[in-house]
Amino acid sequence: MNILIDTNIVIEHFQKGLLSDTDPEFHLYLSVISETELLRFAGMAQIEETFINDFLSITRILSIDSSVARRAASIGRTRSNKLPDLFIAATAIEWNMPLFTRNVKDFKSIPNLNLLESLPE
């Protein structure tokens, strides 16, 4: 099963090892938006940046293409979500993946978006 993971899931993984025992049948993906969010923290120690880069090097990262951009624009016409969330949601929809997030409230009103608050067992 392919699953797009939100930035907050990666942060929770860094803090608590959330993804350490993930079933190998789950293929985890990250939006390029989440990559940006992870790398933008000001004052990040070199060790933290190295840890993030190591994680990113083994993670499948999905770029924004025209179909994702158009889907994000379409969603954004009728909703007040922040642009990064629109791109993450649009990526999940266009790639036909559920979005694993702790910020369900930010995404729950988006049609055709399958949300996961935890990984299936």
Regions found by a protein language model. Name each.
Residues 3, 27-29, 57-58, 62, ...:
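Short loop->beta-strand "edge-of-pocket" segments that line small-molecule binding or catalytic clefts
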Residues 14, 60-102:
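Active-site neighborhoods of divalent-metal-dependent phosphate/nucleic-acid chemistry enzymes
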